[in-house]
Amino acid sequence: MKIVLLDAKTLDNDKRLDSLKDLGEFISYDSTPSELVYERCKDADIIVTNKVVFDAPLLKQLPKLKLIAITATGTNIIDLEAAKELNIAVKNVAGYSTKSVAQHTLTMALILLSQIPYYDAYCKSGAWARSDIFTHLSGGLGQMEGKKWGIIGMGEIGREVARIASCMGAEVSYTSISGNIQNLPYTHLPLEDLLKQSDIISIHSPLTPQTHNLINETNLPLLKKDALLINSGRGGIVNEEALAKHLKEGRIYFGADVLEVEPMKEGHVFLDTSLHARLLLTPHIAWAYENSRKVLIDKVIANIKEFLQS
């Protein structure tokens, strides 16, 4: 049984993955460019990957392949119809990062509300040491209590964000792009109304034809002045060029853990330093807090063991 891990670096080369050696011949690669995928997979019985794409033509060239174990929730990297026709099982891991992504979302909102980067830079610049008073309030300080928090996408993560935000005194509402209006203790609003009314908006939807470019040059002007927009869902939901224009005009704040193209490309509009006072970026890490990553890896290993035993 040959098991090939194609992108161990996406899991920080976690040593827990070494237990796959107990299940067969195990080969691990830090990353795998598209031109090397076939060569590395042609003799594999099981492939473990996070981001490597397997389309129908590639799958048809891998007659030994029995299982693709995805180290993530999304299965969009696999042509699922082709895999089914070829009798290749596909297993993912759902729900492992709910707490992690919710924590990251709240962290981003609190950092922006409290203007932490401004005050941190103020202190480290030596300005506080030169001050004639004990405090400095010029950066502004927003408080969560009483804020209206709008959630786009009320799945497990959206509900966890709603729970925590409510505990901090925010008034939560949500919109459902899929039309799935749930029996929840929060007000459901159409998207336009949510954008108009919310002080903080967080995105937790998957990227679908319905959600692609959902937040764009047409509806961004609906946001309140100085509203916070947080995207910890998927890149591509927010039109980045349009968003940058509103940042440059000083209208809103934006926090993002995901971008349409990852890693971020050189020359990206968000690298414009004139935007940075209203922009907070992290490199797609919300899913990967310590406990969540452990749950993910344990479940990937369990998925492979269950498959081998079936």
In which residue ranges do the predicted regions lie?
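Rossmann-like dinucleotide-binding domain for NAD(H)/NADP(H)
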Residues: 226-228, 232-310
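N-terminal glycine-/charge-rich "phosphate-binding" loop or analogous flexible N-terminal tail
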Residues: 1-44
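Rossmann-like dinucleotide/phosphate-binding beta-alpha-beta segment
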Residues: 135-225
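Phosphate-binding beta-alpha-beta segment of Rossmann-like dinucleotide-binding domains, i.e.
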Residues: 86, 94-148
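Short beta->alpha connector loops at strand-helix junctions that form conserved
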Residues: 30, 71-72, 88-99
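Rossmann-fold NAD(P) dinucleotide-binding segment
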Residues: 53-65, 210-229
